[in-house]
């Protein structure tokens, strides 16, 4: 029973990460799981937030996004490289803060 609750909690946290990233990049949440490239940066940032803020493993994050663990690794690396741009870095930092606060808020 506890295992089911833990999985449910991760799903709601993943939903939070996806909603925050989608809103920040002006795309629909549904586009994040699609194969279309227009939501690519938002999808990469959502994957990055799942790994960094939620501390999910590569495989677990991959399952949540319907992607292979290698894709998650690549997405996180791309976001880390893009953080060289100060504007993008501030955006990601802000998103990390939002997700941390929302994830730790009482239900």
Where in the sequence are the language-model features?
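General nucleic-acid-binding
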Residues: 1-18, 107
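Intrinsically disordered, low-complexity basic tails/linkers immediately adjacent to helix-turn-helix/homeobox/MYB/SANT
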Residues: 2-3, 78, 82-107
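C-terminal helical "lid" subdomain and adjoining coupling/linker elements of P-loop NTPases
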Residues: 8, 32-35, 63
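Short, Lys/Arg-enriched anionic-surface-contact patches
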Residues: 19-43
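Short, amphipathic alpha-helical "recognition" segments used to contact nucleic acids or chromatin
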Residues: 40-56
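Residues in the recognition helix of alpha-helical DNA-binding motifs
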Residues: 64, 74-75
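RNase H-like, Mg2+-dependent phosphodiesterase core
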Residues: 69, 73
């Amino acid at each position: 029973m506890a295992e089911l609750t833990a999985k449910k909690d991760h799903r709601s946290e993943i939903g939070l990460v996806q909603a925050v990233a989608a809103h920040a990049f002006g795309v629909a949440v549904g586009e994040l799981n699609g194969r279309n490239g227009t939501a690519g940066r938002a999808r990469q940032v959502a994957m990055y937030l799942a790994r960094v803020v939620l501390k999910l493993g590569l495989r677990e994050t991959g399952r949540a996004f319907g992607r292979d663990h290698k894709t998650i690794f690549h997405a996180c690396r791309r976001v880390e490289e893009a953080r060289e741009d100060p504007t993008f870095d501030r955006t990601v930092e802000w998103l990390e803060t939002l997700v941390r606060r929302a994830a730790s808020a009482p239900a």
